[in-house]
Amino acid sequence: MKPTSVIIMDTHPIIRMSIEVLLQKNSELQIVLKTDDYRITIDYLRTRPVDLIIMDIDLPGTDGFTFLKRIKQIQSTVKVLFLSSKSECFYAGRAIQAGANGFVSKCNDQNDIFHAVQMILSGYTFFPSETLNYIKSNKCSTNSSTVTVLSNREVTILRYLVSGLSNKEIADKLLLSNKTVSAHKSNIYGKLGLHSIVELIDYAKLYELI
């Protein structure tokens, strides 16, 4: 039987290696690519079929949600499992909205990743019950009226801004023009009703975006 092909995408080599070792418990899985470069993944997808992509929501040059749309344009049947160490409430909710097949917090037991892969490849989705309950909680309801007004691109830029990157550095990372980044920055401040980087940092901490 043909092995199930898997791509692992994460910015940290040690995490990519750890996931690969974890998945070796299932001899039917074949890791065909490990990378943090979305362009390499796109090139691979254009020439070979892939069954599953396991990827961190935070990737150099893009965000996972934007990249998911790109993936589906190339291979509509590929399944996607998101990983993140950031706010489970916020990112798991967006993962569901984006059409991902699963979400696992990096703060959880690593075996959750293996279990999620097994579930997804069996035709199910994997969003742990505690995650779904967290999304439905009052905290997330409060969150939804504010953070969710931002687009995925704006969330990515917000996180770069509060980490201290300049407009030019953000533009270089996301392959955008300075003008486009400035426009996104203005939209972020306008949508959130904020006026300074200090307020933006406090906001990001409040909603666990950093």
Curated annotation (Swiss-Prot):
DNA-binding region: 167-186
Record-linked PROSITE patterns: HTH_LUXR_1, HTH_LUXR_2, RESPONSE_REGULATORY
Modified residue annotations for 4-aspartylphosphate: D56
Keywords: Cytoplasm, DNA-binding, Phosphoprotein, Transcription, Transcription regulation, Two-component regulatory system
Domain Response regulatory: 5-121
Annotated Pfam families: GerE (PF00196), Response_reg (PF00072)
Main location as per UniProt: cytoplasm
Gene3D superfamilies, A to Z: 3.40.50.2300
Protein's cellular compartments: Cytoplasm
Example GO BP: phosphorelay signal transduction system
Domain HTH luxR-type: residue ranges: 143-208
GO MF annotation: an example: DNA binding
Database matches in CDD domains: LuxR_C_like (cd06170), REC_NarL-like (cd17535)
GO cellular component, one term: cytoplasm
Name the record gives this protein: Fimbriae Z protein
